[in-house]
Regions:
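Conserved segment of the thioredoxin-like fold in thiol-based oxidoreductases
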Residues: 549-590, 595, 599-602
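Short, solvent-exposed, Trp/other aromatic-anchored flexible loops in extracytoplasmic proteins
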Residues: 81-118, 122-125
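Thiol/disulfide oxidoreductase modules built on the thioredoxin-like
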Residues: 588-632
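Conserved redox-active cysteine motifs that mediate thiol-disulfide chemistry
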Residues: 529-546
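Short, well-ordered beta-strand segments enriched in hydrophobic/aromatic residues
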Residues: 49-58
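Oxidative protein folding and maturation machinery
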Residues: 163, 251-523
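A non-transmembrane, solvent-exposed segment enriched in polar/low-complexity residues
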Residues: 86, 133-336
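Conserved helix-turn-beta segment immediately C-terminal to the redox Cys motif
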Residues: 523-524, 541-561, 629, 633-635
Length: 637
């Protein structure tokens, strides 16, 4: 018996010794991630295996997947390929439960004791999960100091919101990403929300240097709201002509605040530090925790709420929170300048929602009743939504939209776009605002002229005369400069090659698509249904340029089909930079193609094999990796 007890004791001691060797890091801090769908709950490191405990947070009844090519990389550059999963099968769809939360483990080879941090990556494909700088030494991590430029500015509570200047000049945006690793991101999209540029939200690509710094310069006529789209979050800021805005981006704090597991942990400072143009106001805006969005619900939930409602009932629905938001802003501790801007943002949001009354009520009916394309067109164009007399009088309460200060608003350009859906918009605005003059009217007029130029239609004699009607000469200055640039580009486009304009010919609608692709039978085709006015189409066309270059020796033909909604002049000038075979079909032909192939929007892509079979179809850009994979499959059938 004593011997048995002794053996049991020895086993327990050995077990304790073995367990003592295990190194456990609970909820390790990290530098940045590409998605907050998966989080590291714990890492257990032994002599034989490294176990990463994962908690997943994703939409219920949607799936996530962990790739077999996943790996850990330590701070010395050593790679540790994944062995297997526990609770999840690699490369297999893992369906999220109703709770939207799940747990599983990922097993990797043992990690040396001298390693201080790890990167997790699924690989270098679109949508890959990546977590950079997972810290194995918490104490050392928490002792890290921020650079001296990362300062929190003192807020003057009595400060008033300055009136923006109208000057055509260069705005400078510079920044630095703290703890940057070149694997994180090599460039960032800058979304420009400015009526002085493009109501459809133009994008600039900013390259990031190896030290994590970046610089962008942009011609603007006044204060302009921009948003930087990073994989670890969006960052909004203001830029202005002849001014410099400087950002210090603290990724570890930015991600911590998004995390489910570490949201209540010790902070690492502010997510973003601002210097330069209106730094204290920008800092204050970034810290606002008041939800000023009038209706922040999933669009189908809203459609279910408003379907069948009258215009007045819709108005009451979308403005339900307006009084409480106003009250919360008034009672907040923010500066007078910040409060004024928050109220302007509310005015812009409310104006946009009221302007969209007819469109939203129709869209709700179409979506909830699941109308087909023919029924949708009939209902949308032949149904009248009654708006009672005086319905739009409420816009008088939102008169700040016709002031220069409204240019601070990140919704300003979007609101101008939404106003275009308002029946008799010019007349309604003049009646409700009591004037046909002011910054709002200037910018509405500016957009029409700017868009005409950007669509490769240089200013006419009449439009040149219209430039004199602006309240400030800066608008004419920018339009004239843009006009000169487009004329120069049109001339350059005449010399470009690499694209072919094709005629669809006189064929029946049923024979149209077979006729189009018959010319290219024997080749693998990537067919792109697109439009010149479609922002995602243009973005995707740029995104696949490296793939086109990589596959240039393959037997692949790129075929582009658009309709008459793409203005002919715009189309002719755009396709000079889109190498491939181009078709512009009639409205009737386009409608048939959309209906026959059940195409719900653009861009829509087909992959067609050499025998003429459609092997892949998707609306929305699927990503370069998926596109390439589907083309290779079609070629190798």
């Amino acid at each position: 018996m004593k011997r048995f007890v002794w053996i049991i004791g020895l086993i327990c001691c050995m077990t304790c010794i073995i367990q003592a060797k295990d190194r456990v890091i609970e909820r390790p801090p990290f530098l940045a991630w590409s998605s907050n769908s998966i989080e590291v709950d714990k890492i257990v490191m032994s002599d034989t295996v490294t176990t990463v405990y994962i908690k997943a947070f994703y939409h219920p009844k949607y799936w996530i997947k962990i790739a077999t090519g996943s790996f850990l990389k330590d701070n010395n550059g050593m790679l540790y390929p994944i062995r297997r999963g526990i609770g999840i099968t690699l490369d297999k769809e893992f369906w999220m439960p109703e709770s939207g939360e799940a747990e599983f483990q990922l097993l990797f080879p043992p990690i040396p004791e001298n390693v201080t941090s790890l990167d997790f990556s699924e690989g270098d494909f679109d949508g890959a999960y990546k977590i950079w700088g997972i810290q194995l030494d918490k104490d050392a991590f928490y002792k890290q100091k921020l650079p001296k430029e990362a300062v929190v500015h003192k807020i003057n509570k009595k400060a008033i919101l300055p009136t923006p200047k109208l000057v055509y000049g260069t705005a400078t945006l510079k920044g630095k990403i703290l703890d940057y690793q070149k694997e994180m991101i090599k460039q960032v999209k800058m979304h420009i929300e400015s009526p002085a540029l493009n109501i459809h939200n133009e994008q600039n690509i900013i390259k990031i240097k190896e030290d994590g710094t970046f610089l962008a310069e942009l011609k603007v006529v006044s204060v302009t709201s921009v948003a930087l789209e990073f994989p670890f979050g969006w960052i909004e800021c203001l830029i202005a002509p002849n001014e410099e805005t400087s950002l210090i981006i603290n990724t570890k704090e930015l991600c911590r605040r998004q995390a489910h597991l570490q949201r209540k942990d010790k902070t690492y400072g502010e997510p973003v530090y601002f210097n330069g143009y209106l730094a204290s106001l920008q800092q204050e805006l970034a810290s606002v925790d008041i939800n000023i969005v009038l209706k922040s619900v999933y669009y189908m939930d809203m459609y279910n709420d408003i379907v069948g409602k009258s215009a007045d009932e819709y108005k009451a629905y979308v403005l339900e929170r307006l009084p409480s938001i106003r009250k919360e802003i008034a009672q907040s501790q923010y500066s007078n300048a910040c409060k004024e801007l928050l109220n302007i943002l509310v005015d812009l949001d409310a104006t946009g929602k009221i302007a969209m009354t007819e469109r939203e009520l129709k869209s709700a009916h179409i979506a909830v009743n699941k109308l087909n394309r023919e029924q949708t067109d009939d209902y949308f164009y032949n149904t009248h939504i009654d708006t009672p007399k005086g319905y739009y009088d409420i816009l008088k309460e939102f008169s700040s939209i016709n002031t220069l200060k409204a240019l601070y608003g990140k919704y300003y350009a979007s609101t101008i776009y939404l106003i275009s859906f308002l029946p008799d918009s010019q007349k309604v605005l003049e009646e409700t605002l009591g004037t046909g003059q002011g910054p709002l009217f200037d910018n509405i007029k500016f957009n029409k002229l700017y868009q005409s130029i950007k669509n490769f239609s240089p200013l006419t004699t009449e439009q040149h005369a219209e430039l004199k009607t602006f309240s400030s000469p800066v608008y004419a200055e920018m339009l004239n400069q843009t006009n000169k640039e487009i004329i120069k580009k049109i001339e350059l486009n005449k010399r470009k090659t690499g694209f072919t304009v094709n005629e669809a010919g006189q064929v029946s609608n049923e024979d149209l698509f077979p006729s189009i692709i018959s010319k290219f039978r024997g080749h693998t085709l990537l067919v792109d249904f697109w439009a010149t006015w479609c922002g995602p189409c243009r973005t995707a066309n740029k995104a696949i340029l490296p793939m086109k270059e990589e596959l240039k020796d393959m037997d692949i033909i790129y075929l582009y089909i658009t309709g008459e909604t793409s203005p002919k002049g715009t189309w002719e000038n755009m396709i000079t930079d889109i190498h491939g075979e181009h078709f512009r079909v009639t409205n009737e032909q386009w409608s048939f193609l959309m209906s026959n192939f059940n195409i719900q929007g653009v861009p829509t892509y087909f992959v067609v094999d050499p025998e003429g079979n459609i092997t892949f179809k998707q609306t929305g850009f699927p990503g370069v990796d998926t596109m390439k994979e589907q083309l290779m499959k079609a070629m190798n059938k």
